Amino acid sequence: MKKISLPKIGIRPVIDGRRMGVRESLEEQTMNMAKATAALLTEKLRHACGATVECVISDTCIAGMAEAAACEEKFSSQNVGLTITVTPCWCYGSETIDMDPTRPKAIWGFNGTERPGAVYLAAALAAHSQKGIPAFSIYGHDVQDADDTSIPADVEEKLLRFARAGLAVASMKGKSYLSLGGVSMGIAGSIVDHNFFESWLGMKVQAVDMTELRRRIDQKIYDEAELEMALAWADKNFRYGEDENNKQYQRNAEQSRAVLRESLLMAMCIRDMMQGNSKLADIGRVEESLGYNAIAAGFQGQRHWTDQYPNGDTAEAILNSSFDWNGVRKPFVVATENDSLNGVAMLMGHQLTGTAQVFADVRTYWSPEAIERVTGHKLDGLAEHGIIHLINSGSAALDGSCKQRDSEGNPTMKPHWEISQQEADACLAATEWCPAIHEYFRGGGYSSRFLTEGGVPFTMTRVNIIKGLGPVLQIAEGWSVELPKDVHDILNKRTNSTWPTTWFAPRLTGKGPFTDVYSVMANWGANHGVLTIGHVGADFITLASMLRIPVCMHNVEETKVYRPSAWAAHGMDIEGQDYRACQNYGPLYKR
């Protein structure tokens, strides 16, 4: 089967078409702008899979309808998923713009005095607004000389932010969400909304009963040699935590081995269901070898599976991590309890950063007063206003231990192409595997337990669906916090101490939902959230605007909010603009 190609970025150099001196004097400068833009994007960006981003430049500068059509024909054949139009001069607005209604698009008008690039930018954006095809504006803050081929820092920031978000849009389009099971314990996010995936993300939903997973395990529809490799890897790397079950529920060595074996098999089979596995065709399972073209998945687990079979904690944690028995590799996106909306937030974060995502319950707000009462410890530093306990038995990526290091030696989570085997081993060494608590998981299983290092910048996100409004996105930038060990132990033992923990302190603004830490917790729209490494809320905002998903809560500086230019026509308050524009334009893939 032919492999689906990755989306490319189309670069459209547009030009004043008047011959006999005007166009000729601009050809080189205009095409050089396109080449410089392509070089920047190719150097600075990668796809989430690690592949280099490719740019496709129009064969000629575009002065009118004929050349615009020729450019579009080329882009259509090259799988261009987003476009950037560049020009240093006046051109003919509506005659030269990209008219594809679903492809994200931006225009960079060169800020120079010799030719009016800004005038074209304004004229072209007016045409986009009038035609109902929003576009992003890129215009340098400072005037440049005509022969200056450099890309200013503010222009570079917008080019990269637009491209990251646009690539995420293009990468999701045409893929599927694998809904493995149904609704878990009444959790609304696991009531998978096909219309949301189709209309806003351009994706399909593949609904598969959990009996398909059982069938693959029981009928050995997997690579048996790989299973042996996985078991050997676990034997070498897994450290086991204490068994907190009552004696009558504790398993012997043989039973524990069977639970581990099935947990690893679940990881293999869910992966194969998502992306396919050619080795299955070798054993006569051609249909199963294809997979479901899934860019994200969710596993219901509770309770119809977990009451009799090992839970999905081990499988989900391994799949979401950037490494397994095959070494360092691209992380998958698998939502525990089939919370598809948290899965979408995970997918967004992964596409924007290329990193693994930390799925968690937004479990408890601990005020400074409560912590001092319970532990005698007075919070300070990042934690001085209180903290939120993020903890869940399921699919937190082991990368979330933050045992990887950036170029300055700081704890972080990195895209897989930057992770060394030593860093992967360090994440494994920081993780214990604790037998599942029988009262919750009668079929057994192992939950990963680690503690996220402190002082690491994170962005917490969540997608919710509101009847009558549609999807909304929540964003909270903040940091992980490290507590003294005795304080952590006291707090952690008040909940389930066999699960992974991140202590999170959101950045406060003193206003609205970010008045204090309690308000962040109180305004969070569901029981789950996602941690993405870095303060990348601005990228989420740009991506959400492309998909027409309003942001109902964020603490990103206003100067970093970057949305299509037409949003400015929807009022003077930028968050009200967002709601009105998203309602006006409707979902990106209107269905």
From Swiss-Prot:
Tagged with keyword Zinc-finger: no
Location of the protein in the cell: Cytoplasm
Enzyme active site: E337, D361
EC number of the protein: 5.3.1.25
GO (cellular component) term, any one: cytoplasm
GO molecular function, a single term: manganese ion binding
Biochemical pathway: Carbohydrate degradation; L-fucose degradation; L-lactaldehyde and glycerone phosphate from L-fucose: step 1/3
SUPFAM superfamilies, per database record: FucI/AraA C-terminal domain-like, FucI/AraA N-terminal and middle domains
HAMAP family: Fucose_iso
Quaternary structure annotation from Swiss-Prot or TrEMBL: Homohexamer.
Task performed by this protein: Converts the aldose L-fucose into the corresponding ketose L-fuculose.
Stated name of the protein: L-fucose isomerase
Organism: Escherichia coli O6:H1 (strain CFT073 / ATCC 700928 / UPEC)
